[in-house]
Regions:
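Catalytic core of membrane glycerolipid acyltransferases/transacylases, capturing the structured
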Residues: 25-41, 54-56, 70-124
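Soluble extracytoplasmic domains of inner/organellar membrane proteins
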Residues: 133-166
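Polar-ligand-bearing catalytic/cofactor-coordination segments
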Residues: 118-120, 221-227, 240-243, 273-274
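A cross-family acyltransferase "interaction/gating" segment
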Residues: 106-108, 156-235, 247-259
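Residue-level preference for the first positions of well-ordered beta-strands
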Residues: 71-73, 141-147, 175, 217
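Cytosolic-facing loops and C-terminal tails of multi-pass membrane proteins
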Residues: 236-274
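A transmembrane-helix-recognition feature enriched in membrane-embedded lipid enzymes
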Residues: 1-62, 109-113, 211
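A membrane-cytosol interface segment of integral membrane proteins
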Residues: 116-143
């Protein structure tokens, strides 16, 4: 009984602080818009806020593997909206989102303020994105994150990765670093991190706020060179994500002709803190 009451009080307190953090997010977003990207990096604002949100939610990030430095295309398996907080807090990258989000109330305002790139679903939808993204990368701007599976999963497997967005790395000559996220069950043994199926955002946020805390592993995979066809690059990046998660490699699709190993991509790297 006492534990239930204390748990309810903790959830209520977290909810109030989370609402305050949301108000702070809009304040930061407005500041970024007023200052402009040359005075304040939008990705810095998202990272600053995400680190505080993770602390409030009781989410601890454990990092494993060599973290490369410099501009990169970061690709990652997709489990939850929490992924965005984890990656923004760890890397301060730009993100790619579906074009509908641009016009969503509140969320669209935040996404636009932190320099999100947008992609339209369907045939030819990636062309406008690539037109904007490739020169941006060639100009030496920051890294960006792609979730090439195209949807969220329960985290137990990795879906085939769509190769079309890998064209940005190939065209700009930017290396690809695979990332792998694994959420551990909470202290009550529940897998609450996956945001899948008919789940609603409000209900999921409620479960996360009520949880005693989560641990997420962020694994940095081996850097992949852009000097290979995008289909091959996508398959190799997916294979590296699967390796980081302890999963067997998926057989190469018929469109992928894997010959000799790809040439190594070796910019400076630093060990990720555990």
């Amino acid at each position: 009984m006492v534990a239930a009451v204390l748990g309810g009080l903790r959830t209520g307190a977290r909810l109030l602080i989370f609402l305050a953090l949301l108000l702070l997010a809009f304040a930061v977003a407005t500041l970024l818009r007023l200052a402009g990207p040359r005075r304040l990096r939008p990705a810095w604002g998202a990272g600053w806020w995400s680190r505080r949100a993770l602390a409030l939610l009781g989410i601890r990030v454990q990092r494993h593997g060599p973290r490369s430095r410099g501009r990169r295309m970061l690709i990652c398996n997709h489990v939850s909206w929490l992924d965005i907080l984890v990656l923004a807090a760890s890397e301060e990258p730009h993100f790619i989102a579906k074009s509908e989000i641009r016009h969503w109330p509140l969320v669209g305002y935040l996404a636009n303020s932190v320099g999100t790139f947008y992609i339209r679903r369907g045939r030819g939808g990636a062309t406008p994105l690539l037109t904007a993204l490739v020169p941006w990368l060639r100009a030496g701007e920051a890294s960006f994150v792609v979730f090439p599976e195209g949807t969220t999963t329960d985290g137990r497997d990795v879906l085939p990765m769509h190769p079309r967005l890998f064209e940005a790395a190939v065209a700009a000559g930017v290396p690809v670093q695979p990332l792998a996220l694994r959420y551990r069950p909470d202290a009550r043994g529940r897998d609450i991190a996956p945001f899948i199926g008919a789940d609603t955002l409000a209900a999921h946020i409620g479960r996360v706020l009520a949880s005693p805390g989560l641990t997420v592993e962020l694994h940095y995979g081996a850097l992949q060179t852009p000097r290979q066809p995008r289909d091959v690059l996508a398959w190799r990046a997916e294979t590296e994500v699967r390796r980081c998660l302890g999963l067997a490699a998926r057989a190469a699709p018929s469109s992928v002709h894997v010959g000799a190993p790809a040439p190594a991509a070796a910019p400076a790297a630093e060990a990720a803190a555990a």
